[in-house]
Amino acid sequence: MAIKTYKPYTPSRRFMTGLSSSDITSKPSVRSLLMKLPVTAGRNNNGRITSRHKEGGAKKLYRIIDFKRNKFNIEGTVSAIEYDPYRNCRIALVTYKDGEKRYIIQPTGLAVGDLVISAEGGLDIKTGYAMKLKNIPIGTIIHNIELHPGAGGQLARSAGASAQIMGREGKYTIIRMPSGEMRYILEECMATIGTVGNADFANISIGKAGRNRHRGIRPQTRGAAMNPVDHPHGGGEGKTGSSGHPVSPWGMPAKGFKTRKKKASDKLIISRRKK
């Protein structure tokens, strides 16, 4: 997918880049697969900020995505490729032979007119086909991977993401995650063949602050620019460096300090992600 540039009508627009929409079909979205999500703007049910630097952003409708791929042994045809405002990859509208329509994440190479199918048994290894991990050959590139059978894909879903099957051991399949982490996942879990499309998303330049505001991202203020009451780095006469190691507003070390809690599933991690 090509990256497009813009004429520098304003200084901020000079360095802004975007993605070409030539792959998107000019069909309206399926209304039955659209829904409105509540805008929390980073607040909890008490109205207090629990996630900083968030706001409402541009109005948008959520597309209901089929992450479970549980419509087994019924062929579907890709009838449209659409933009999804809630994710950085494209989505594909699949029309099945029984008339049902579902959205799936578009893998690289999946185009209008292609066939997709999912099954609990084995299938040909083709982009967009979904099956259980135990039926996928070692070395295959996959995405939209379940962590628990039947729960729906949770891993490798963003633009350009993919994982690889590295081996098998007992009832587990060894997966190399996009981060480089090696992990056991139950062989009964579903996964989809291929790499998530729109990999060029990582190369676009936001270019201007207003574009992030449209995405619902508010500006971040440096701790050193605050008062002492607001941040451990705050205060001082003029520009001053922080004393000691950098910390969060709540005093937690900000660089290199491990905050991950131990949990039962840690035993399924063979090796940690690469730095």
UniProtKB/Swiss-Prot annotation:
Keyword rRNA-binding attached: yes
A molecular function (GO) term: rRNA binding
Pfam families, alphabetized: Ribosomal_L2, Ribosomal_L2_C
InterPro entries assigned to the protein according to its UniProt record, in alphabetical order: NA-bd_OB-fold, Rib_uL2_dom2, Ribosomal_uL2, Ribosomal_uL2_bac/org-type, Ribosomal_uL2_C, Ribosomal_uL2_CS, Ribosomal_uL2_dom3, Ribosomal_uL2_RNA-bd_dom
Region (Disordered): 220-275
Compositional bias of kind Basic residues: 257-275
GO biological process: cytoplasmic translation
Keywords for the protein's UniProt record, in alphabetical order: Ribonucleoprotein, Ribosomal protein, RNA-binding, rRNA-binding
A GO cellular-component term linked to this record: large ribosomal subunit
Domain of life: Bacteria
Record's function text: One of the primary rRNA binding proteins. Required for association of the 30S and 50S subunits to form the 70S ribosome, for tRNA binding and peptide bond formation. It has been suggested to have peptidyltransferase activity; this is somewhat controversial. Makes several contacts with the 16S rRNA in the 70S ribosome.
Subunit annotation: Part of the 50S ribosomal subunit. Forms a bridge to the 30S subunit in the 70S ribosome.
Protein family per UniProt: Belongs to the universal ribosomal protein uL2 family.
Protein name per UniProt: Large ribosomal subunit protein uL2
Natural source organism: Wolinella succinogenes (strain ATCC 29543 / DSM 1740 / CCUG 13145 / JCM 31913 / LMG 7466 / NCTC 11488 / FDC 602W) (Vibrio succinogenes)
